[in-house]
Amino acid sequence: MRIKYILELDGVKIGYTEFEYADPPMGVVHGKIIFEEIDSPYDLFKNHCKKFNVEITADLPKDQLIATYIIPQLKVFLQNGNQLQGWGGAIEGMDSDEFKIEFSGVSSELMQTEFRHHLKKYNEQE
């Protein structure tokens, strides 16, 4: 069973991710964003970043491609309703393809509990 992690931007639910991938030693989880009722994720993030002065690392308006540093107002919630703790989430993607979130600063304790499947997979590779 996959776990859905709810994403909110400035207090508004925008969708979820399943955090399909992780780099446990680095405290990073990442995955595809599934948007709910968002016509243009590019416009959503571009407007948000301009409004809140969040640094954009790549912006190609013609392709509607954007990448950002950590967005402080982007919150991730666990199934129990608690907010995922860490440094925060950055996004990248384009409207015609997909968007991904990379969440950094996950503690080793949280990696061992919430993301134990990723930790197990990592340990089996060594």
Feature map (PLM): residue ranges:
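Terminal leader/tail segments of proteins
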Residues: 1-9, 13-126
